[in-house]
Every structure is written in structure tokens, then in C-alpha cells.
Amino acid sequence: MFGKKKEMEEMTEREDGLIDYNVYVMGTGEKAINIVFAAIVLFAVGYVFYHSIFLSALLMLLALKWPKIRTNQIIEKRKNQLTLQFKDMLYSLSSALSVGKSVESGIEDALKDLQVIYPDPQTEILLEMEYILRGIGMNNTTESMFSQFAERAHLEDIENFVDIFVTCKRTGGDLIEVMRSTSNTIGEKIEVKQEIETTISGKKYE
């Protein structure tokens, strides 16, 4: 119903035009459609249970709360997608570093790999990697660019990785091992979360 580019624009609240992944501003039209949709569903549910137009109409008032609930769902979904995309980025970047490439060259290679995995140019991780490369091209450090990304992502896995990444860059630590370890950890968390969701869904239908 709403294009990904439009959704990305509505999600941006910062003056610099970058995405804050904890923010999603629902457009007026989108909000209206969500309220109407929720009102119809609530009316139908109310009528099935109460067989009363009056009570069903009262239940429709709860539809006003739906845009906020939907906004939180969109934010959560976007952050889950970003986590998975970040895992793929780490895998590609660690592969590039393992053959002797610099971090900067590795990011360029990782971006090319990600463009194959995610053909939509508006995919979050593609936009973030492109922004990081532009920043590096303007003489910003890799550490500062990743740190900015982590601040906007509001994701523990990314924040933890960036903290270790910055330390490794300063002390000469094993970046390849850090990236592989972080990628594996994220993958394990995703698998556990999916198993829990599958179990919960299964119990609902028992």
C-alpha cells in the first residue's frame, strides 16, 4: 500500500536526514487508513460477540489506539530486519578481511555482496553502508562512522560489536574473529527467537 521509500522518509525524524530506528512517524493518510481498518475489524468482532450495533460502535473507539500499536510493530519489524542484514554484512566483511583487505576495502566488497542479497536499493543496510563509505571518503574514521550507525540503530548487538570494533582498531585486536563471533551470536539469537515464536504459535492452536 505504501512504498518502501515513502516508509523510509516517514521514519526519518533527524535533521541530518538519517534514519533513527526508534522513530516512525505515520503519515496522515496512513494513519487514517489504519484507524478505518481497525474500526471495521472491531465493529465486526463486536457484532459477532454482542449482536449489538451500539456496543459494536462503542468498541470502534478503540481503533484510535491502533496507529500507536501499529507504529511500534513497524519499528520492531524494521529493527529485526536490520539485525539480520547486519549479520550478513559482518559475514561478508569478515570474508574480505580474511583475504588481507583493509577494513575500508572490505566494506566496499561487503556492500557489493549485500547488493546481490538485497536488490532493493532502499534496503536499510545498503543505505547505511553507502553512508559509511561516503563518510570515510570525507576523512571520517571508520570507528566514528560505525559509532554513528550504532547510535541510530538502538540495537544491543550492533552497539556491542561497535564497542569491540573500536577497541580492536585501537589495540590491534583480531577483527576477523570479532566479526565472525558477533555474526554467529546474532544468528543464534535469531534462531532461538524463531523457535520461541514457533512454539508459542503452536500452543495457540492446540
Stretches found by the model and what they are:
Residues 154, 158, 162-206:
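Membrane-associated alpha-helical segments
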Residues 1-91, 190-198, 203-206:
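Hydrophobic alpha-helical signal-anchor/transmembrane segments
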Residues 60-151, 156-167, 174-176:
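Juxtamembrane/interface alpha-helical elements of multi-pass membrane proteins
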